[in-house]
Amino acid sequence: MRISDLLLPEFDVEMKNTRTTLERVPADKAEFAPHPRSMPLGRLAPHVAQLPAFGLIILTTPELDFAKANFKPVPFESAAQLVKVLEEGAAQTRKALAAIPDDAWNDNWKLTMQGKSIFDGSRFLAYRQMFLNHIVHHRAQLGVYLRMNEEKVPAI
């Protein structure tokens, strides 16, 4: 069995759980933040929706320099818009995940910012830590934001 065959079911569950969470994000609470140093909901929710695109970068490139990346955060409009962004990114990432050969998981992957190393390790570790664990972390934050705004928190 290929490594990607082991990872695809987990990817599918995490994307489903993320979709369920994003579906409940209230459009009228974009400015809400539980603490002055916390991201407002209108920035956190789009960040979560766009994270699969980061997974795609990890799976298909040897490195990313944030200073050279042409990243534009999506504006927060609605839960439906966030779900659409998530699903588009997840579909591309799933396709790349299904296609990646086993030996590519051991390839080195780097994340830098203006020449300064942020991450330097295996593609597998980058995928796991910087994409999958990252989306779970921020999805949990969204759950707290939902609870604090009397929204239903999905049972995931």
What are these regions (language model features)?
Residues 8-23, 29-72, 112-156:
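Short, contiguous alpha-helical
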Residues 1-9:
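Basic/polar N-terminal segments that are highly enriched at the extreme N-terminus
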